[in-house]
Amino acid sequence: RLVPKEADKYGFVLWVDEQSHLLLRVDMVDKEGNLVEQVLGVDLDRQPAPAPWLVTLARSKLPDALALEDAYPAPQQTLSWHLTWLPGGFKVLSQDRHQLVSTSLPVDYMMLSDGVVDLSVYVSRVDPKQAVRQQLIRQGATSLVSFVNEVGVEITVVGEVPTETAKRIAESVQPLARNEAVQ
């Protein structure tokens, strides 16, 4: 059982086979212990020996696995926004500006992680008259919070955290002062 110290993250209940040490089930639970999402193995077919292709793969020279910091080097682009609050353990792993495929509009993007959960934060200018004022959606463990602030900036946070946490992160997005460094 992995129990978060704060209520701004989900907890995990891990079910591991005692003999094989394989992960059989993962329950993601909220602060009250209610099931939010579950991943479950339903069938395991153990073989006396590995398949030939697996033996070949095991003998292959493969590149070393990348650490998160190497896969997503620290902020690549300076954005005009920063976060004034993050849940404990989270940090910005990557950030950039790109165009959304669906609208061709530019969006500032930040990828956050605590090593277990990844979150995406999108910030873009929109016409406040045409934008949806606020959206709060949760499907399983994934929350999506999106709102347009008073100056016509749409802020969207997506990830496997409670909706209240996603909302608090979105509300913490602030413009950088001209001479302020990126966090």
PLM features: residue spans?
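Gly/Pro-enriched, hydrophobic low-complexity segments
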Residues: 1-62, 136-137
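Short, well-ordered beta-strand elements
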Residues: 24-26, 151-160
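Short, solvent-exposed recognition patches
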Residues: 61-151, 161-164, 168
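Short, gly/Ser/Thr-rich active-site loops of penicillin-recognizing serine hydrolases
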Residues: 47-78, 177-183
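Short, low-complexity, Pro/Ser/Thr/Gly-rich segments in the mature regions of secreted, periplasmic
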Residues: 166-182
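Hydrophobic beta-strand residues in large extracellular and virion-surface proteins
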Residues: 2, 119-121, 155-157
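Envelope-exposed proteins and targeting segments
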Residues: 10-12, 37, 108, 117, ...
